[in-house]
Curated annotation (Swiss-Prot):
Major site of localization recorded for this protein: membrane
UniProt domain G-alpha: residue ranges: 32-355
Lipid moiety-binding region (S-palmitoyl cysteine): 3
Lipid moiety-binding residues (N-myristoyl glycine): 2
Name this polypeptide is given: Guanine nucleotide-binding protein G(z) subunit alpha
Source species of the chain: Homo sapiens (Human)
Pfam families: G-alpha (PF00503)
Residues where ADP-ribosylarginine is found: 179
Keywords: ADP-ribosylation, GTP-binding, Lipoprotein, Magnesium, Membrane, Metal-binding, Myristate, Nucleotide-binding, Palmitate, Transducer
Region ranges (G4 motif): 266-273
Keyword Membrane annotated: yes
Lineage per the UniProt record: Eukaryota, Metazoa, Chordata, Craniata, Vertebrata
Listed Basic and acidic residues bias regions: 1-14
Stretch list, region G5 motif: 325-330
Amino acid sequence: MGCRQSSEEKEAARRSRRIDRHLRSESQRQRREIKLLLLGTSNSGKSTIVKQMKIIHSGGFNLEACKEYKPLIIYNAIDSLTRIIRALAALRIDFHNPDRAYDAVQLFALTGPAESKGEITPELLGVMRRLWADPGAQACFSRSSEYHLEDNAAYYLNDLERIAAADYIPTVEDILRSRDMTTGIVENKFTFKELTFKMVDVGGQRSERKKWIHCFEGVTAIIFCVELSGYDLKLYEDNQTSRMAESLRLFDSICNNNWFINTSLILFLNKKDLLAEKIRRIPLTICFPEYKGQNTYEEAAVYIQRQFEDLNRNKETKEIYSHFTCATDTSNIQFVFDAVTDVIIQNNLKYIGLC
């Protein structure tokens, strides 16, 4: 009896040691795993950041992966032009050449088959080139803040010959500029500085935000993306609400949420290149009537940054780490993410009492 009990005790002790080792190993693994949550409104550049992580830390896009983006890029180009043509009537803009009205009819007749096949036929290419070159269409494009048009429109429409070629294979820049609405939750894992990162991208549309709560558990850091150039634009969802106002409200709710008291908060003030171009034409007062500064990139960017940082109601205990970014610029994102990682590591060490 005593011998049997001793044997059972030894086995229990062995099991206990195995469990302890497993728990220590799991604890160390969790310390080495960084869960990054990408948040922000639609069109703020979150999905482009995910693509950049794949390029910088996961080997990029091989030939087959590049080919898979061709139908999306074709769709983006066609969709951009059809949006411009539809907006002509609403903005009361006429074609410079009346013959383009027939091309517009042809555009809508030919786009369905082209989108389903993922290719632009020579006939459709001719139609698209003539429409895009028309001064009336260009005037409509210059007023794109009055309707919904993606940032990549001019990039693709200025290069129709290349993307319509039968042997077209998307470049990395083509892929970075492609736009596909994120629905659901997209996870991307990669290793950097001996840490495993799990980056979680959640759709930014209002209808998608109810899913965010499912991602909050165990978050190490939040990267909140802001569309700097969206200060004169309205939401897709209601065509009434300012995109910048929506972004500020959303950031306020995240920054001051009790879930994230010990979570590093990083602010990506994105699309700085588009802000620099737009601010010369459209004043910041269209969004911030109280703004008294010059309509220069430097002053406007700092003013917008301050609007977000001032929402932090816990400045003594919570710091916001702000960076101006261009999500389509790989070198910029690589530099910024390196700095972000150092901040996350330092804050993690403080949190577990090792720093």
